[in-house]
Regions:
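C-terminal soluble interaction/assembly domains
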Residues: 2-7, 14, 25, 31, ...
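Secretory/export targeting leaders with adjacent low-complexity proregions
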Residues: 12-266
Length: 371
């Protein structure tokens, strides 16, 4: 069955049969089911909101999943998904889906500033305020969602250059210290990290807020400088250049004015990643970041794409996270896990592919890219 539904000038949604999904029969549906089922634990506090699919129907399916064993065998999990959901391929602007990757860095650090660990990650300042971008305060850039509260009203918050020059010094906002400013910079990009503490133990930090300035990819900055070739500005290549050019690295990194503030999060299960925007822990190769304004958290998505080494990646994933760079109906960011090996894959991932949304049976997806 192939039936195009809800067409628009920029978007086509096509109903499919599961037989048209390459690799569906051989997929590890049990792992996908476990990732999906975790959404049931947050239903009462964070129910899904209707965007691309019927949130009420999705919540009902999550409750049914929660009544089943967590270790459901692959064949039973496959039967569950096929009975509860129908697949719809999303094609935007006449093109295919596009997939990148992200990961959780693991680095050494200390809660105490030392000669070795001197680069801080900051907690949220008390003068940072968030506001609705639809009604920004007068006089502020309408693109800003965060600002600094002053006696005269909100103003733009300090940017990366100002903060690294000491704008927040002396306020006791340092959450933890790491050794390498480049590591800290990439923690800002990933929005989370696991830190092996010099004084013993492990802590996890995750995104809490940001300065509000626009994000500038420094890969693009390095290409414009002629330091890297277009198409070769992978995360590994960027890190190598920054390490080889320490005198210029700080200047380049400060071109990204956006600055991230963190909170400490518990390491409840070292086999899982940090808590995602959907309030569930990320699962290696199963959690997908999507456009939160278009899609519904906890919805299954079938992904067909290729990895940086050319191997095919065909996986049933769950929409559990989001990101400021993840924009569009067929845009996905794959969580590859924690540590350096995951970072190598994530940093080179940039592939076209199929984005197939699984919608609750009896309802049709509604993805509106006109925002």
């Amino acid at each position: 069955m192939k039936e195009s539904v809800a067409p628009s000038r920029d978007l086509t949604i096509t109903a499919l049969d599961y037989s048209s999904l390459a690799g569906w029969d051989d997929e590890g549906h049990g792992a996908a089911f476990r990732a999906f089922r975790r959404g049931a634990s947050v239903l009462s506090r964070h129910p899904p909101k209707s965007h691309s699919v019927d949130a009420v129907a999705l919540a009902t399916i999550l409750k049914r999943a929660n009544a089943l064993p967590a270790d459901l065998p692959d064949n039973h999990a496959r039967a569950f998904f096929e009975a509860e959901f129908a697949p719809y391929e999303i094609v935007s602007d006449g093109g295919t889906g596009f997939f990148t990757g992200y990961y959780e860095p693991i680095v050494a650090g200390s809660r105490i500033r030392t000669d070795r660990f001197a680069t801080p990650l900051y907690r949220v300042p008390d003068d940072l305020v968030a506001f609705d971008p639809a009604s920004p305060p007068p006089g502020l850039d309408p693109a800003l969602r965060f600002a600094r509260q002053t006696d005269k009203g909100p103003v733009a918050y300090f940017d990366r250059d100002e903060i690294e020059a000491g704008a927040l010094a002396g306020r006791g906002l340092e959450l933890v210290f790491v050794a390498d400013p480049v590591d800290a910079f990439f923690m800002h990009i990933q929005g989370a990290a696991r830190i092996d503490l010099a004084e013993g133990g492990t802590m996890r930090v995750s995104y809490a807020a940001k300065s509000g300035h626009a994000y500038t990819p420094i890969g693009r900055v390095l290409i414009e400088m002629g330091a890297l070739e277009a198409g070769k500005a992978t995360m590994d290549a960027i890190r190598q250049w920054l390490a080889a050019n320490p005198d210029t690295a700080a200047v380049v990194m400060r071109q990204n004015r956006s600055f991230i503030f963190f909170r400490e999060a518990p390491v409840e299960n070292p086999q899982l990643g940090p808590i995602a925007a959907a309030k569930v822990p990320l699962a290696d190769g199963r959690s997908l970041a999507v456009d939160r304004l278009l899609h519904t958290f906890h919805c299954p998505v079938w992904v067909e794409t290729s990895l940086p080494d050319g191997k095919s990646f065909r996986r049933l994933m769950i929409a559990q996270d989001t990101g400021s760079a993840i924009v569009g109906p067929a845009r996905g960011d794959i969580f590859f896990g924690s540590g350096a090996a995951a970072g190598t894959i994530a940093g080179s991932m940039a592939s076209k592919g199929r984005f197939v949304l699984l919608a609750p049976r009896g309802s049709r997806p509604n993805v509106n890219p006109q925002r």
